[in-house]
Swiss-Prot record:
Keyword Aminoacyl-tRNA synthetase: yes
InterPro entries assigned: DALR_anticod-bd, Gly-tRNA-synth_bsu, Gly-tRNA-synth_heterodimer
Catalytic activity reported: tRNA(Gly) + glycine + ATP = glycyl-tRNA(Gly) + AMP + diphosphate
Organism: Azoarcus sp. (strain BH72)
Name of this chain's protein: Glycine--tRNA ligase beta subunit
């Protein structure tokens, strides 16, 4: 069977840039899977995917024109039904053979073998392999249908649907066109190149010539990764030539790669007077609206230059450079206007307008929320022994920039602009910084708010949201989390654990709930539900940080509410697990838990006078001896030392279970031994539920 390189390309109108890489990769992957499933390509066959603004494509080497034939054996029916007493085929067998296209002459070749408890007839036939020319169109059609496209469109007079109009379909196997029709288009070998730098149609001679032909004749770099790498090389080279630096550009680089087919980087410039506007505004304007790459000096200060990724390569790029500078100037002027206009009104004066901004129809306005945040942030700051007045002031101003001109135009700048306006209004740096930082952490790996005042406001903001929405029954389900409550929960946990802050989570939740008007939060048991939700988030957070699963489960089984102490407890449990006594003590603890579950009523305190066996006396006295030391270590947060002391109980615990019948027939003896085990369990499980460590 002739094997050759296969090319499939869809030429389209400009595809959605943010979805382009996924469209290209999925399209190619699904075609490769279809070829492999039909035996036309090796199971480990490699392929390349291509994606540019106007095309998605795949090339795959070693694709056969026809798959190898294969033997297929299928069960027909039980012999008792298939053959009569003389061994001749019954009408039932003949009917089935006719339906399957098996000639009557094939009966003698049928195989008889046991199938379960009955003998059955089996037919083996050689099935011809799939032919590429007959199945490729169906494979491409299925790949198109499998693309992650939320909305499709129709064009022209046909019924085909796709994310954008499709103009050409190329399907080549080696040098031969593979016939087929997909999306109302007949397959061919012609495509088009760059919209401006190439003219007319381009014929692809062979599948292997696809990439070099597009580059040479079409002025298109079809490989997404290659185009991205080329843009990055040019960006870094230009920045180095100018003695400037780029900041984090990954997302913008991906987007720009999806917007150009023949990238060239040029340097643009704007008037230095615009640098009087906060640089975050200018950066966002250049990135979001113009897709420019801002340049910075070594200190991270914005320069009045930027890099342009053009879709054209020109010998004299002056028109491109001046044109882009001309386009960005009105944007920067708008930003300056918003900034100057906003500074005319103090943040304080904007608060009444928040009464007209609905936070949630069941939770009131943003102004009502601000009043809750102010009270809660003050309480948290007081618990921390921090500046309560500063925390209350920062919380009061935290949402005022939501009704500013700048944030109205660029919502991403909320908090950032609040800080600038607070400083302009004469607020202290601590208050202004907290206004900006109260949104942090906004995503995984984001910085935490610096300082206790900022942390207090950030906690208040997130706890108010969590308590409010849980209190009205708006709980995240599955992958639906419209109010970003999972993110808020992780933010609270990270602040408490990483700052760290000596605050009780249950008390914080109760404080937040107390700030709402009576009767507003009506969901049953919502505080307990919220704490369970946050513990589940904490479990995931600890696992992602590399914590041992069993150790995490052991620590969280005690439902700790001092989140700041969890890392130390986790480290102590992981150290304890490495001790030779750990497994035996964990197993004993598990046994104790099971015994106490079956006991009737509370065991009470053990009575030394009722102890009979030497082993139980030894255990009792050992527990009494080490209990103060364990409790002292726990009180001092020396959890590793506490567990090491407990490891010394192994000999007494082993001896107790080897020589003492806990469930004695005499009731007082039985109850006393249960009381001793309860006392032991209470001592052993002050740091974590040790029974969870048992295999």
């Amino acid at each position: 069977m002739t094997a050759n390189t296969l090319l499939v390309e869809l030429l389209t109108e400009e595809l959605p840039p943010k979805a382009l890489p996924r469209l290209g990769e999925t399209f190619a992957t699904k075609i490769a899977e279809g070829l492999k499933a039909r035996g036309l390509a090796a199971a480990d066959g490699a392929f390349r995917w291509f994606a540019s603004p106007r095309r998605i494509a795949i090339t795959m080497a070693g694709v056969a024109a026809e798959a190898a034939a294969k033997e297929v054996t299928e069960k027909l029916m039980p012999v008792a039904v298939a053959l009569d007493a003389d061994g001749k085929p019954t009408p039932a067998l003949l009917k089935k053979m006719e339906a399957k296209g098996i000639p009557a002459s094939a009966v003698p070749a049928f195989e008889r073998r046991m199938d379960g408890k009955a003998e059955a007839l089996f037919h083996t036939a050689v099935v011809p392999g799939a032919r590429l020319a007959e199945v490729l169109a169906a494979i491409v059609h299925d790949a198109v249908k499998a693309l992650p496209i939320p909305k499709v469109m129709r064009w022209g007079d046909g019924d085909a649907t796709f994310v954008r109009p499709v103009h050409k379909l190329v399907m080549l196997h080696g040098a031969e066109v593979v016939p087929g029709r997909v999306l109302d288009l007949d397959a061919g070998r012609s495509t088009r190149g760059h919209r401006f730098m190439s003219r007319g149609e381009i014929d692809i001679a062979t599948a292997d010539a696809y990439e070099p032909t597009l580059l040479a004749e079409g002025k298109v770099v079809p490989d997404f990764a290659e185009r991205r790498a080329d843009i990055e090389r040019q960006l870094l080279a230009e920045a180095a030539r100018l003695g400037a630096q780029l900041d984090d550009y990954t997302d913008l680089l991906d987007e720009v790669t999806a917007l150009v087919e023949h990238p060239t980087v040029y340097v643009g410039e704007f008037e230095a007077e615009f640098l009087a506007v906060p640089q975050e505004c200018l950066i966002l304007t250049m990135r979001a609206n113009q897709k420019y790459f801002p340049l910075f000096d070594a200190a991270g200060k914005l320069q009045n230059r930027f890099l342009i990724v053009s879709n054209m390569r020109m010998e004299d790029p002056v028109n491109i450079v001046t044109g882009n500078a001309r386009v960005v100037r009105p944007r920067l002027s708008d930003a300056r206007f918003f900034f100057e206009t906003d500074k005319k009104h103090k943040l304080d004066s904007r608060l009444p307008r928040l009464a007209n901004v609905v936070y949630h129809n069941k939770l009131g306005s943003v102004l009502e929320r601000v009043e809750r945040l102010e009270a809660l942030a003050g309480k948290i700051a007081a618990r921390l022994g921090s500046d309560e007045a500063a925390a209350r002031r920062a919380a009061r101003l935290a949402k005022a920039d939501l009704v500013s001109e700048m944030v109205g135009e660029f919502p991403e700048l909320q908090g950032i602009m609040g800080r600038y306006y607070a400083l302009h209004d004469g607020e202290g740096a601590v208050v202004a910084d907290a206004v900006q930082a109260h949104y942090q952490p906004r995503f995984a790996g984001d910085a935490l708010p610096a300082g206790n005042v900022a942390a207090a406001v950030a906690l208040a903001d997130k706890l108010d949201a969590l308590v409010g929405f849980f209190g009205i029954g708006m709980v995240p389900t599955g992958d639906k989390d419209p109010f970003a409550l999972r993110r808020a929960a992780l933010g609270v946990l990270r602040i408490l654990m990483e700052a760290p802050l000596p605050l009780d989570l249950a008390a914080l939740v109760a404080d937040a709930a107390a700030g709402f008007k009576p009767g507003l939060l009506t969901a049953d048991g919502f505080q307990a539900q919220l704490l369970d939700f946050m513990r589940e988030r904490l479990k995931n957070l600890l696992r992602e940080s590399g914590g041992e699963v069993a150790a995490i489960d052991a620590v969280l089984a005690l439902a700790p509410t001092r989140i700041d102490l969890v890392p130390a407890k986790l480290a102590a449990v992981e150290a304890f697990r490495a001790l030779p006594e750990a497994e035996a003590l964990a197993a004993a603890n598990k046994r104790i838990v099971n015994i106490l579950k079956k006991a009737e009523g509370a065991p009470g305190e053990p009575d030394v006078a009722l102890l009979q066996e030497d082993a139980e006396k030894a255990l009792f006295h050992r527990v009494i001896e080490i209990a103060p030391l364990v409790k002292s270590h726990v009180a001092n947060e020396d959890y590793t030392d506490a567990l090491c002391v407990l490891a010394g109980l192994r000999a007494e615990v082993d001896a107790f279970f080897d020589g003492v019948m806990v469930m004695a027939e005499e009731p007082l003896t039985r109850q006393n031994r249960l009381a001793l085990l309860a006392q032991l369990a209470g001592l052993m499980n002050q740091v974590a539920d040790i029974s969870r460590l048992s295999a």
